[in-house]
């Protein structure tokens, strides 16, 4: 489900909030990549990919932090992300299975979904936000986020032995589309 374009108007009323929330999204994405390395060291290609994603996400964090500083704003404290919590709850209620492969697939689909939604939000911001600097900033970020979500899906397919990953992804997408009906009303990256 596409984000309602009116979300950008909400964001424009509080640029500080979207930038702070975005910075922490990047930090959490980097932390998630590190967790994947620690949990799945038996997959050298995944370790290499997660290491690269971690570096890139921290570069994005630094870029967002720089945008805050340029505007005389501070990072502030981390915000809770109800969207991420809702996705996590869906997966915890056994939407694939509890085998090691099922847990792995869930983690990959979870990361892919967050990256895909972030990419979609970056696209909207790159097309519609009035601030030309932020428009270009989000256009650049959108391209890397698209690569990230496909990376996670690729690993789910490669190492999710015995699981119909495409079916699980379609079901997760359907859930997320319903979930998004209650989002898009706050000046946060997923809100």
What are these regions (language model features)?
Residues 1-191:
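Non-heme di-metal
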